[in-house]
Amino acid sequence: GWESGIVPGSRDVATEPVSAAKIGADQVKMLAEMIGYEGQIAILSAAATMDNQNTWIAYMKEELKKPEYAKMELVAVVYGDDVREKSYNEALGLFKAYPALRGIISPTSVGLAATAKAVTDQGKIGQVEVTGLGLPSELAAYVENDACKAFGLWNPIDLGYLNAYATYRLANRQINGKPGVCGKDRDVQSL
């Protein structure tokens, strides 16, 4: 994805929208609350080759090992390749393969909107809960009809500011690799 880091040896600085561990854990927590901490769940991701997606999924799997999720079972991880139609069809495949499915996490805005549409079209609102990372502009109708009760995303304005700030500081040789505070007085993990 566009928010994935490039190979460490090929960059001078990298910023994350939010910690990968938090993204993974928060998505599991959101879904767990929706399904009462029990039932079959699946992940509908972007492409199997996307480092950010794989990292978030690894953290989701770690979160699911905690005792509070003992009654939740991850039954599948599928990939829609960040293509709306393929993601939609993958969601339909999950409904068919796992009739007792209670929830789907989709850590990709394309996949989340497609999954919410599939839940809506198949009359599964309230039966299969959906969460993940998405854009309010793409999910408004699905929030209103309860197909997607909650989702997350980092603040792109803050991320843009941080990237501009880091680029400016890098160009002026003001980055030393030590933790610091960015221009809006927010803690930055490595400037």
Predicted regions mapped to residue ranges:
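Structural recognition of the beta-strand scaffold that forms the well-ordered cores
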Residues: 1-3, 17, 40-45, 76-77, ...
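Short beta-strand elements in bilobed, periplasmic/extracellular small-molecule ligand-binding domains
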Residues: 12, 40-43, 64-84
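Short, hydrophobic alpha-helical segments
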Residues: 31-39, 95, 163-175
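Hinge/cleft segment of the Venus flytrap/periplasmic-binding protein
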Residues: 48-52, 62-65, 162-191
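Hydrophobic alpha-helical
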Residues: 60, 76-142
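Extracellular/periplasmic ligand-binding modules, especially the Venus flytrap/periplasmic-binding
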Residues: 107-116, 144, 154-176
